[in-house]
């Protein structure tokens, strides 16, 4: 197999190709491992020009403009290959390439630092308000509701549910490029309700911790609840750009109930998705990310939850009671340490049998009819549900003090938790989120 030129290229450029991309290219050649040498050229020519891969290209620091231009010129000469989206914040772009085009890029573009396979990312789906002590948080005689705070739900979209009436103030669609809010999967709508449902359709019974917060739907996952690294990065960069364009009414919080397997790079910042969320954090956006649903094994924290900066949220099973006495960590909730040996998750929030908003006729709504609660609500479990609940409590903190930095919000959330004495922080994090204890003041 080593006689094939592309296999030799992979070996020579292993430091510039991430592991999934190396494996993808090599897998193309496995069926031809025992092919006679005189047929190698024939089969390789077919492979090089017919197979197509979606990739993310990272350029050397300070070379984004030049690198993007050079890559575009190379791909113009290649069949079935093209540049797609630019990610200026993280010095990358996405592209579709054949093996032949990949070879040309690595040979002719000296500004390329690394090329990543554009891997799949999925929605992390496997009483909540009361259990997190967010039913009524009063400061200075005012009940905090998240009013004036904007949360971007980076997910499958948001259905304009009656419990969100008048508060979906923006929508961006990286999947189908639609302009009006919708959710063909249902996961994003449930998460939006976990943040900010008013409970209007249930006389307040099923309301989120921030029932007056504004929402922006950023659709990065498709009808089946999956997307790609490029889709997610594009959504995150859209949020950063939104704030640059709207400095007086910015996105304060991003809730991301999604993730993919965390690969072991030299350090977590080599992960393009980690770099994207850390750019958002540095731009002043509080980022809440799901830990993942691959527990109870250790080292199962998903990406981008492996980022040291962001708030990584695990799932608590509150056993459908407001008391914390019977709370346990959900068996499915991913555990640390991360693949980089860092402690995670940061915090736990309710994530089992959470009742929130239903998106009628969506993919999940049709698939799990037994999970419907009346005509307006739906039950789901997962760190996907815990994450927006934590984001909703962060909204209360920012309503009380809008000038706090993301680091300060994270510290308040961790310091305000209900703690388990002498428990492993790689399972329990800092403890269970507690709105009453986390919001400063009396």
UniProtKB/Swiss-Prot annotation:
One of the record's GO cellular component terms: cytoplasm
Keywords associated with the record: Cytoplasm, Hydrolase, Protease, Serine protease
Induction: Is expressed during the late stationary phase of growth. Is down-regulated by SinR.
Class of enzymatic activity (EC top level): hydrolase
Coiled coil: none
Residues at the catalytic site: 155 (charge relay system), 187 (charge relay system), 384 (charge relay system)
Disordered: annotated span: 318-337, 423-442
UniProt key word Cytoplasm: yes
Disruption phenotype: Cells lacking this gene show normal growth and sporulation.
Gene Ontology MF terms: serine-type endopeptidase activity
EC identifiers of the protein: 3.4.21.-
InterPro entries the record matches: Peptidase_S8/S53_dom, Peptidase_S8/S53_dom_sf, Peptidase_S8_Asp-AS, Peptidase_S8_His-AS, Peptidase_S8_Ser-AS, Peptidase_S8_subtilisin-like, Peptidase_S8_subtilisin-rel
Record Pfam families: Peptidase_S8
Regulation acting on activity, per entry: Is completely inhibited by phenylmethanesulphonylfluoride (PMSF) in vitro.
Compartments reported by the entry: Cytoplasm
Keyword Transmembrane carried by entry: no
Domain called Peptidase S8: residue spans: 122-439
GO BP of this protein: proteolysis
Role, per record: Displays serine protease activity. Seems to have a broad substrate specificity.
Family of this protein: Belongs to the peptidase S8 family.
Name of this chain's protein: Serine protease AprX
Organism from which the protein derives: Bacillus subtilis (strain 168)
Gene field: aprX
């Amino acid at each position: 197999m080593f006689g094939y030129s592309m296999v030799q290229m992979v070996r020579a450029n292993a430091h510039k190709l991430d592991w999934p991309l190396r494996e993808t290219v090599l897998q193309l050649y496995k069926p031809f491992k025992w092919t006679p040498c005189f047929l190698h050229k024939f089969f390789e020519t077919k492979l090089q020009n017919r197979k197509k891969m979606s990739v993310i290209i990272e350029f050397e620091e300070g070379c984004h403009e030049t690198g993007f231009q050079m890559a575009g010129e190379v791909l113009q000469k290649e069949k079935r290959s093209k540049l797609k989206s630019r990610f200026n914040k993280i010095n990358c772009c996405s592209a579709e390439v054949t093996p032949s085009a990949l070879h040309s890029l690595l040979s002719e573009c000296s500004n390329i630092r690394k090329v990543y396979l554009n891997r799949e990312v999925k929605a992390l789906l496997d009483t909540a308000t009361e259990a997190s002590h967010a039913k009524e948080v009063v400061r200075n005689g005012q009940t905090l509701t998240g009013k004036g705070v904007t949360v971007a739900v980076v997910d499958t979209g948001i259905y304009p549910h009656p419990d969100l009436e008048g508060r979906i103030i923006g929508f961006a669609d990286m999947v189908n490029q639609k302009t009006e809010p919708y959710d063909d999967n249902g996961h994003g709508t449930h998460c939006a309700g976990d943040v900010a449902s008013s409970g209007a359709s249930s006389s307040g019974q099923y309301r989120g911790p921030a029932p007056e917060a504004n929402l922006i739907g950023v659709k990065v996952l498709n009808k089946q609840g999956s997307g790609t690294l490029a889709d997610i990065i594009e959504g995150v960069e859209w949020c950063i750009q939104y704030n640059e364009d709207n400095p007086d009414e910015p996105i304060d919080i991003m809730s991301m109930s999604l993730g993919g397997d965390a690969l072991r790079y030299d350090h977590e910042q080599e992960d393009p998705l980690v770099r994207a969320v850390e750019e958002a954090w540095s731009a002043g956006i509080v980022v809440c990310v799901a830990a993942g649903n691959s527990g109870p094994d250790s080292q199962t924290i998903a990406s981008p939850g492996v980022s040291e900066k962001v708030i990584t949220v695990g799932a608590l099973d509150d056993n459908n009671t407001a008391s914390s006495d019977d709370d346990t960590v959900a068996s499915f909730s991913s555990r640390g340490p991360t693949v980089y040996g860092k402690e995670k998750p940061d915090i736990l929030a309710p994530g089992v049998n959470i009742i929130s908003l239903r998106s009628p006729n969506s993919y999940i709504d049709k698939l799990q009819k037994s999970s419907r609660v009346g005509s307006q609500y739906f039950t789901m479990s997962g760190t996907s549900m815990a994450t927006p609940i934590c984001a909703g409590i962060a909204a209360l903190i920012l309503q009380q003090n809008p000038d706090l930095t993301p680091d300060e919000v994270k510290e308040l959330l961790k310091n305000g938790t209900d703690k388990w004495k002498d428990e492993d922080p790689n399972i329990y994090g800092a403890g269970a989120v507690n709105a009453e204890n986390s919001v400063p003041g009396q």
